[in-house]
Amino acid sequence: MNNLKLYKENPSIFQKYIELTNQKQILIDKVYKKIIENNISKKITLLDIGCADGMVTVQIIDKLRKLYQLEVTAIEASMELINCFKSRINYDINFINNNVESLDELPKSDFILIAHVVSYIDNLEIFLEKVMNSLNNNGIALIVVSNDHSDDKKVKSSLNKQNSKDTISANVKKILSKKKVKYDVEIVDSEIDVSGIGNMNDNGKTIIEFFKHERFENISSSEINDIRNIILKMSNGNKKIIKREDYIWIFNK
C-alpha cells in the first residue's frame, strides 16, 4: 500500500481531521440504513477494512447490536490504532493487524466497509476480486472515495498541480463493470470546518497536515501559506469547504 506511512506512524492526524467534519455521522447513518433496508439476516458478519481507531465501526456496531447478532472482523495496519479501538469496546472483535493486500483472502462477510482505503491499494483489481469473493450471498460492500468535484480534492489537485484522467472512483467503477458486478453510486456531501486556518490554531494545523501529508513542523512557511490561501478561497461564509464523496454500493445478488 502506498502513501500510508504518515498515517501509520502518526494516526492522530486523521483522527483529529475527522473530528472537523460531519462525514463520520453521515457514514454511520448510511450504513445502518442500508443494512436495515436490505434485511440481510438476523445474524450479520461485518468486515471493516482499514478500521482505524474504530470511531466509525464502534458506533455502527452499537446501533446494529440492538437488532442483530453480530460477528465483526476489523483489519488495520497500525497496531497503535487497533489498541485505541480495543480501548473503546468491552466485547469481542476479531482484529487482523496487517496490510490488507498481504492477505490471501478476506473473511466471508455479509457487509464490508471500505472507507477511504482504496487510494492506498497498489493493485485495485486484485483487491476488488478478494472483496467480491468474500461477500456472502445477498451481501453488500460499501467503498467510499472522494468525488472529483469535492473541494478537498480540488485543494489536493492544486497543491500537486496535476489532474489525473483516471480517478480512483472511475477506476473502481471500470473494474466492477468489467467484472459485471452489480453496483450503485450515491453522491454524498459533508462539510469540513477550516476556520482554524485563519489564526492557524491546532485545528488549522491539523487541516494543513492532512492536505500536505506531513507533520506541520516539517512544512515550510511558504507551503503553509499556499495551502492556507487555496483553502480560504474555496471556503464559504461559514469557513467550511464541501467534502463530496462517492458511495459505491456493491451487491452480491
Question: Residues of each region from the PLM?
Answer:
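A short SAM/SAH-binding and catalytic strip from SAM-dependent methyltransferases
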Residues: 111-123
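A short glycine-rich, Lys/Arg-flanked "PGG" loop and its adjoining helix->strand segment in the class I
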Residues: 125-140
